[in-house]
Amino acid sequence: MSMFLDTAKIQVKAGNGGDGMVAFRREKYVPNGGPWGGDGGRGGNVVFVVDEGLRTLMDFRYNRHFKAQSGEKGMTKGMHGRGAEDLIVRVPQGTTVRDAETGKVLTDLVENGQEFIVARGGRGGRGNIRFATPKNPAPEISENGEPGQERELLLELKVLADVGLVGFPSVGKSTLLSVITAAKPKIGAYHFTTIVPNLGMVRTQSGESFAVADLPGLIEGASQGVGLGTQFLRHIERTRVILHVIDMSASEGRDPYEDYLAINKELESYNLRLMERPQIIVANKMDMPDSAENLKVFKEKLAANYDEFAELPQIFPISSLTKQGLATLLDATAELLDKTPEFLLYDESEMEEEAYYGFDEEAPAFEISRDDDATWVLSGDKLEKLFNMTNFDRDEAVMKFARQLRGMGVDEALRARGAKDGDLVRIGKFEFEFVD
């Protein structure tokens, strides 16, 4: 059995835009050729694409860094640099993508072929053709390409199944799955036999089919991470119907009704919406001597403690060993699926329509701090973007950047903080003197 990996943390880096070019037209019969430098090409995006052939996030265990190519530099004759190809990263169906820093859900990838840009490439820098004006017809200025977006992502795989089998360890879920489907889970008589979700397809006598997931056995405290914890509870989220399997033989000395309450408590603690899914109680191991009496007591306790206005869940006595009651159970499950809508895992408001790539309009344009060596340090997304796109090899570009800082109010803010003529100011690794 291959290792099942259902979470992964990765780094993605989109390509930088290509640098714009400073060039001038120099031809024999064109005395005033003017600027001729083209724009840089767009950097490549990092794009997730759903591949139905993948079953786990195993590919991300050893490959955690994904970097798209940068765009080409602008060329003479006003020609643009070539844009970079997007980097395609294939993920399995059922992958939820979160921003690792904020925890915000970026997308939920469930359809085969579905695409989502997780990091957008930077635009190409402008060549000097773009900066020509009547006052400056031959500008010696260009822009560097915009840096591509870089972010850390958390991937979570939640299996795609219509029906989920839940219950304490060793209640017979794996055996049940193997009997009703062609799945061949590893089975043993010890706790946490199932350490990965097993999937199988069921076909009823009437010809209806649905996917069933045998989810690892739960114990009390799983919703708080005890035992195998929430790493398996997440797989229940996509199911529409829950088959709650209970060992009616009480062969391990536990009370079937207490088991029923404990599992439901874990489902409710993990996510309140799990309890909105319809449940069918599967009374398993009815071929054992004490099962019939235990089922009678179970029904009495259930009726006595259930809300009088609520509908009691259906109970189906079965035996996975003798196949007693299986056909009736599967027909009822298919019927319940037909009238149960899909449950959205996330509200549309919780998800980004597209990953956010610009600087935050509500964030300050710049921030000022002071280092231990008395150097003033400027930071901020907008300021750093302007800095990164400035070509400091060109005097005109440096002067333009200085005007931009002044227009943003950086000079006034430094004076207000007490900056004096000659003080060092740092942006990233670049230092310059403050001139009052």
Swiss-Prot record:
* OCT domain boundaries: 358-436
Q: What is its main location?
A: cytoplasm
Obligatory cofactor(s) = Mg(2+)
**Annotated residues for binding of Mg(2+):** S174, T194
Gene Ontology BP annotations: ribosome biogenesis
Question: What region holds the Obg domain?
Answer: 2-160
Which of UniProt's keywords are assigned here?
Answer: Cytoplasm, GTP-binding, Hydrolase, Magnesium, Metal-binding, Nucleotide-binding
Q: What is this protein called?
A: GTPase Obg
Organism for this UniProt entry? Streptococcus gordonii (strain Challis / ATCC 35105 / BCRC 15272 / CH1 / DL1 / V288)
Phylogenetic placement of the source organism: Bacteria, Bacillati, Bacillota, Bacilli, Lactobacillales
